[in-house]
Swiss-Prot record:
SUPFAM superfamilies for the chain: WD40 repeat-like
Function: Component of the eukaryotic translation initiation factor 3 (eIF-3) complex, which is involved in protein synthesis of a specialized repertoire of mRNAs and, together with other initiation factors, stimulates binding of mRNA and methionyl-tRNAi to the 40S ribosome. The eIF-3 complex specifically targets and initiates translation of a subset of mRNAs involved in cell proliferation.
The family this protein is said to belong to: Belongs to the eIF-3 subunit I family.
Annotated coiled-coil segments of the chain: none
Naturally occurring in which organism (per UniProt): Aspergillus fumigatus (strain ATCC MYA-4609 / CBS 101355 / FGSC A1100 / Af293) (Neosartorya fumigata)
Superkingdom of source: Eukaryota
Protein's name in the database: Eukaryotic translation initiation factor 3 subunit I
Localization per record: Cytoplasm
Amino acid sequence: MRPILLSGHERSLNQIKFNRDGDLLFSVAKDKIVCAWWSANGERLGTYSGHQGAIWTVDVSPNTVLLATGSADNTVRLWNVKTGECVKVWDFPTAVKRVAFNPDGSRLLAVTEKRMGFLGTIAVLDINYGDSQGGGLENQADEPSLRITCTESKATVAGWSYLGKYIIAGHEDGSVSQYDGKTGEQLENVQAHEFDHQINDIQFSQDRTYFITASKDKSAKLISSRNLAILKTYVADTPLNSATITPKKDYVILGGGQAAMDVTTTSARQGKFEARFYHKVFEDEIGRVRGHFGPLNTVDVHPNGTAYASGGEDGYVRVHHFDKPYFDFMYEVEREQLRK
């Protein structure tokens, strides 16, 4: 499995994202630039420039018409994917740590930082796609249609459940909350991870009925969107920054490594800078993929389950297209199921 090495960033990666078709990969880093790549061959399509600070997060609408980014310059920007122009800027009092489109792309959530006397919030913005020719994308609402304020512990990550019914948020204190997608009312809160070990990532299954969290407490959890029941736990030996669920095969991919500031040795083995594959059902680790020089900050998987990409503290994005053995590998019990 030879990786394609994408070097378009000068500083460490913050988030990477495949679009719904899987032909494009978007990456954002601490260097104020958004890159778009062809996922098949790693060719760079272009960049989106305009942010004045590190970009923490990126998401692309389900129809690949709009791209949203959230940055340390306290703005959310909306871009026209095709032309690269910025069609809208929303200003917030603090940095924006996570943006996510709902399943039909009609709404966008933005998680803001708790700073300078402002509480952390989750703002929901209504998105307008203009006419069929791609005109009128600039006509976006100026104010959020919904604002959820996190009074207890700030939200670090968030996403939408199936049908956009719930907003699921991961918090700094290791808990996971479920909010009503329409009213913003908190319905449920579960201490999913060790107290005070923040949740660094949350990614949903393809049907959004369950999701995976990655935490500083060295574990990842598979959780139901409906009632926040913890279904599975994947234990690693290093803090986790990112986790994703693979379609086609029942695996999950976890990315992490010692925090950059804690690294004392230069051996990549020592820092555990690998992407780890676990069996989704049996919770066993089944393999690792090495390559990054420094912690993995973000992982994402191709929507067809044919490839995955990881972005690291080293400023590189590595795209791996899976080989045949990856798809052939099965547990004995899975084989028996097939024979029946």
